[in-house]
Swiss-Prot record:
Its EC number is 2.7.4.6. The keyword Cell cycle does not apply. The lineage of its organism: Bacteria, Bacillati, Cyanobacteriota, Cyanophyceae, Synechococcales. Its cofactor is Mg(2+). This is Nucleoside diphosphate kinase. SMART domains: NDK. Transmembrane segments: none annotated. CDD domains: NDPk_I (cd04413). ATP binds at K11, F59, R87, T93, R104, N114. Belongs to the NDK family. It comes from Prochlorococcus marinus (strain MIT 9312). The gene is ndk. PANTHER family: NUCLEOSIDE DIPHOSPHATE KINASE. Signal peptide: none annotated.
Amino acid sequence: MTKERTFIAIKPDGVQRGYVSEIIGRFEKKGFKLVGLKQLIPSKDLAQNHYGVHRERPFFGDLVDFISSGPVVAMVWEGEGVILSARKLIGATKPLEAEPGTIRGDLAIDIGRNIIHGSDGEDTAKFEIDLWFNEEELCEWYTSDSKWRSEN
């Protein structure tokens, strides 16, 4: 397994409901390293670019309106297998199908208010990280316990 980066965003419903620290804590407890963090209210342009793959879908406008309706906590996490692990931590897109113990399984009810976004692959992660962050906003740093997290 290789060290990789992924983009995670706590959506306006997750921020408004006070889940920021709990969600960050779940990623830290898993052993991933936070290398980028900021809170912003996304512009319509940013939201449209982020969800561009859904542009032709009937829910696109509502999705853009929602994600730009309030503060989003945008993050970049780093670690071995972080993309797949993050998807497992987050749970199924439809909260009622998400397993207990996942973020959506524990905290969300409605697909339109499912609290969190996570990149679904390496190409998507790179695109989303580059869209939301400038290179100078990402911190290269080393944890003092990194030798206890993995063999490599």
